[in-house]
Design a protein with these regions (language model features):
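Pocket-lining segment of extracytoplasmic ligand-binding domains
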Residues: 139-248
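Boundary at the C-terminal end of the N-terminal hydrophobic targeting segment
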Residues: 19-23
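Bacterial N-terminal signal peptides
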Residues: 9-18
Length: 300
């Protein structure tokens, strides 16, 4: 009888240890919630579920993060992976040793896109603004200072045109969200603004705006790129691992993501075609160095 009890206790101990081991295999993926946490979960929860279903013994949880929450989450060890704009990744790479493991292939207007840009807009009725130089002395709005497509790309284009937005604009505001910037321009709160490419088309498709009400400043044309754009194109958002996350786990995630089909629920909700191995983010790092932002921000 005593021997049977010992076997039962031993079996329970094994079960408890196994359960504890599986509990430790939960991985949190931080996602930059550029349009708020609710939309971020709507877009990316299915990707977490997809990875959980594809990788045995591991679960993946999506954690929406605001612009000011990404770096603290990395530094504190709250997350194992993160999905953020390309500039924020470069900052995390330089500061915290993060490593890009995959790049999303966006799905927009039926085309797979590995690159994106920024678009500078004004009201179509504004006859005073037709080129970048016309923005001097005007009120301007961007998304956030840390927003790559919603500020830093346009900032670089403005500097290249001889315009310092911090001294040449009468007012420089940050709207917090891409849609807020579009509405501020539409309603005359500011003279012009900048958002990432595909924002205007997305809002127009949803019936929220009419593209004809806006004028594109410094329009650029690129082969196989369907959106209004005012800047150079840069690689799309990467999925990155924090320094402490094992390469083995990262590789298993990349392998699973590369198997994702455009018709899968996770791809549809995230509005992506799929994923590829990480692209080269050196041009993004060069932009940061030029602007002295992100990892290369000048000490105050």
């Amino acid at each position: 009888m005593k021997k049977n009890r010992l076997w039962v206790l031993f079996a329970l101990l094994i079960i408890a240890l196994a359960a504890n081991g599986y509990a430790e295999e939960n991985y949190k993926i931080g996602v930059l919630a550029k349009n708020g946490p609710v939309k971020a979960l709507q877009m990316w929860k299915a990707t977490g579920d997809y990875l959980t279903s594809k990788i045995p013994g591991k679960t993946f949880e999506i954690v929406p993060l605001g612009f000011n929450e990404v770096y603290p989450a990395i530094e504190s060890g709250k997350i194992s992976f993160f999905l953020a704009n390309s500039s924020m990744f470069v900052t995390a790479k330089v500061r915290y040793g993060a490593k890009a493991v995959a790049t999303m292939v966006n799905s927009r207007q039926g085309q797979p896109l590995k690159y994106f840009g920024g678009v500078i807009i004004t009201s179509d009725a504004n006859d005073q603004i037709n080129a970048l130089n016309d923005l001097k002395g005007k009120k301007f709005m961007a998304v956030q200072e840390s927003s790559f497509g919603g500020w830093q790309m346009a900032y670089k284009a403005l500097l290249d045109a001889g315009i310092n937005p911090y001294t040449d604009f009468t007012k420089l505001d940050f709207g917090g969200k891409h849609d807020n910037v579009v509405y501020a321009v539409m309603n005359g709160v500011v003279d012009a603004g900048t958002v990432r490419t595909d924002t205007l088309e997305r809002m127009a498709s949803a019936g929220e705006i009419d593209m004809a009400d806006f004028k594109i400043i410094n329009p650029q044309k690129f082969n196989d790129f369907p959106f209004a754009c005012s800047t150079t194109l840069y690689p799309e958002w990467p999925l990155a691992k924090v320094k402490s996350t094992s390469d083995t786990v990262a590789r298993s995630i990349v392998d699973a993501l590369k198997q994702l089909k455009a018709t899968d629920a996770a791809a549809k909700s995230a509005k992506v075609v799929g994923w590829v191995d990480a692209l080269d983010y050196a041009p993004v790092e060069a932009l940061q160095k030029t602007l002295k932002v992100g990892a290369f921000m000048a000490a105050k």
